Amino acid sequence: MSIYEESLIFHEKYKGKLEIKSRVKVENSQDLSLAYTPGVAEPCRAIHKDPSAAYMYTRKWNTVAVISDGTAVLGLGDIGPLASLPVMEGKSVLFKEFADVDAFPIVLDTKDVDEIVETVVRIAPTLGGINLEDISAPRCFEIEKKLKERLNIPVFHDDQHGTAIIVLSGLINALKIVNKNIEDLKIVVNGAGSAGTAITKLLLSYGAKNIVVCDRDGALNRDIEYSNKYFEELANITNPNNESGILKDVIKNADVFIGVSAPNIVSKEMVKSMNSDAILFAMANPTPEIFPDDAKEAGAKVIGTGRSDFPNQINNVLAFPGIFRGALDVRATEINEEMKIAAAHAIANSVSDEELNPNYIIPKAFNLDVQKKVAEAVKEAAIKSGVATI
């Protein structure tokens, strides 16, 4: 039986991976009068007088919505909101299991950016944070930007930033192994969608100087006029030498390859053209840009993928639960670059110097100490950067 057949049976058995449970008992009239009428009027009055009291008298402080329109689901593409629901339920389960965050799925039957934004803004009073999920680019950039402008709670598109944080954490540790500094590297990012864009921007924030971003047509550079304004932006902040050509051209003399693109597009010959002790994060799923054994045979030093059956899995579950735990605990108004970098360091530091080796640069997903470390680091960064409100 395949994992897909087994999962179908699993989902049929449980008929949903989430349920709502009461935190209080209602066993007599006194309980009823406290939990509901007439007693409930008093916290209502308190919140009406001071809206921040909602964090004291309701579950707002620990509640996150996992919101999707179903337009970019896993490797399935645009399958619509209803078909995306199992993924959003699963994401909500991970929030609860890994960081005790109460998350619930909301799938929206619209692809219109402004309709999505308006809908989320209208339900935001219930929420302490918003996790955007599986929304196609470039709409995901617009939706996140507009929501951040209108809301004072964390808004986080995990497909962008969760991936970027794990990539940075892996790169921090990989650089210890090859004894290189990020500012000296040539980094090639293949894939200019949501993940590739966020990875590029976070690495630049961390100190990278020479990143070349490729899409299916080749390197983004300043000699090309792009109809996509996000490509234009990337071209203006990357590729300092204004290189042109397709992937096999620009990967020459690169120190790092980061793939969020398509299967089997990196050959052994391309790896051989990279600098010595090359680092490759080939994250296309289920088939990576190059398989680890092939990359190693071609001379690569450190290889990561998106798969759990190879070493060094780039897995967002190491990031998003702890990030939201930390942000919620200090009532952060946003998740900023300082918090993302702090999370990346916390994840990287969860691998000790004694454990660190080319096949172990990223901790295992079920090491729950990682989430605690991430949460603490994010809280501290939120306080230092001025976005914590308690």
PLM feature segments, named:
Residues 12, 55-60, 96-97, 122-124, ...:
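Solvent-exposed alpha-helices and their adjacent loops that cap or buttress functional pockets
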Residues 150-164, 280-285:
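Short, acidic/small-residue loops that bind anionic groups at enzyme active sites
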Residues 158, 282-390:
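Adenosine-phosphate binding glycine-rich loop
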Residues 74, 81-99, 157, 161, ...:
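Glycine-rich phosphate/diphosphate-binding loop of Rossmann-like nucleotide-binding domains
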Residues 232-301, 308-309:
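Rossmann-like adenosine-cofactor binding region
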Residues 1-155, 381, 385-389:
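N-terminal ligand-binding/catalytic initiation module
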Residues 105, 131-134, 155-158, 189, ...:
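General beta-strand structural signal in soluble alpha/beta enzymes
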